[in-house]
Regions:
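Conserved recognition-core residues within compact binding domains
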Residues: 1-73, 77-89
Length: 89
């Protein structure tokens, strides 16, 4: 399942899957992800300048409810590269 990515409440040309893939909606290509400090990142071309995003946060923002406005996203299995929505809380 795919959902649009919003940055600062603005819709972007990107989508995030419930498994943690990021897609450019204009080209339909999956973005390559980099790993830093154990977390998967990708860079989105948004104005006024590109934004580097942690993939687990994009998944959580799109697929998880956060009624208490919790600041952190936890990987249930401790694997920071497992960004499946079922592994996040």
């Amino acid at each position: 399942m795919w959902k649009n990515i919003y940055i600062d409440n603005q819709e972007t040309n990107y989508s995030i899957s419930d498994t943690g893939e990021v897609k450019n909606n204009k080209t339909n290509k999956i973005l390559k992800q980099q790993i830093q400090n154990g977390y998967c990142h990708c860079t989105l071309s948004v104005k006024p300048k590109p934004k580097r995003c942690r993939v687990h946060r994009l998944v959580a923002q799109a697929f998880l409810e956060n009624p208490e406005n919790k600041e952190f996203v936890n990987h249930k299995d401790g694997n920071r590269q497992n960004n499946n929505v079922d592994n996040l809380e």
